[in-house]
Amino acid sequence: MGVTPVSNQPLVAQQPKGIIDPSTGKPIGSNDAFFGEINNELADKGFLVTSTDELINWARTGSLMWMTFGLACCAVEMMQLSMPRYDVERFGFAPRASPRQSDVMIVAGTLTNKMAPALRKVYDQMPEPRYVISMGSCANGGGYYHYSYSVVRGCDRVVPIDIYVPGCPPTAEALLYGVLLLQKKIRRTGTIER
């Protein structure tokens, strides 16, 4: 077993690069013996060096806590997401009952004028950074009740929306895809300066 060399020369592992300075492209302290020794030690042990913001983004995407704001029939599809068939918790997306413990709010259903202040109050109670998923045609733009006098024509008039999930009602797979898109968006953008 093992790798056989093409020539009679023994196989040698690559030299460890250590911590790379992004401005120069060379290892940090490459001309300093002390830093060269530390870089060799870290590279030899298999350490991963990253920025703090990337570490926070990675941790945040794997531990999103969501709060339900089910207003109509879309809430039934939202509940299916936690059931064993889809089991959204395997993606690190767990439900919470309190807005003070949640990062994500899923607005599912028709938002009326009377309910809009409550939605804003719950949104304001969530800690930063906070994200909102608008689920279904009614939450996205009023849906079937768009021309009613008592319906808000899209919850983006009350709170900022990060992900729109279309459908009437959208399937649990569509909402799961929206959750995965939100995690991708969090990885792509910084959470500290949002």
UniProtKB/Swiss-Prot annotation:
It is an enzyme of class 7 (translocase). Its EC number is 7.1.1.-. InterPro entries: NADH_UbQ_OxRdtase-like_20kDa, NADH_UQ_OxRdtase_20Kd_su. It catalyses: a quinone + NADH + 5 H(+)(in) = a quinol + NAD(+) + 4 H(+)(out). One of its GO terms (molecular function) is NADH:ubiquinone reductase (non-electrogenic) activity. Binds 1 [4Fe-4S] cluster. Its cofactor is [4Fe-4S] cluster. Keywords: 4Fe-4S, Cell inner membrane, Cell membrane, Iron, Iron-sulfur, Membrane, Metal-binding, NAD, Quinone, Translocase, Transport, Ubiquinone. The keyword Cytoplasm does not apply. It is found in: Cell inner membrane. One of its GO terms (biological process) is electron transport coupled proton transport. It is a peripheral membrane protein. SUPFAM superfamilies: HydA/Nqo6-like (SSF56770). The keyword RNA-binding does not apply. Residues 1-23 are annotated as: Disordered. Residues 1-12 have a biased composition (Polar residues). [4Fe-4S] cluster binds at residues 73-74, 138, 168. GO terms for cellular component: plasma membrane; respiratory chain complex I. NDH-1 shuttles electrons from NADH, via FMN and iron-sulfur (Fe-S) centers, to quinones in the respiratory chain. The immediate electron acceptor for the enzyme in this species is believed to be ubiquinone. Couples the redox reaction to proton translocation (for every two electrons transferred, four hydrogen ions are translocated across the cytoplasmic membrane), and thus conserves the redox energy in a proton gradient. NDH-1 is composed of 14 different subunits. Subunits NuoB, C, D, E, F, and G constitute the peripheral sector of the complex. Belongs to the complex I 20 kDa subunit family. NCBIfam families: nuoB_fam, PRK06411.1. PANTHER family: NADH DEHYDROGENASE, NADH DEHYDROGENASE [UBIQUINONE] IRON-SULFUR PROTEIN 7, MITOCHONDRIAL. This is NADH-quinone oxidoreductase subunit B 1.
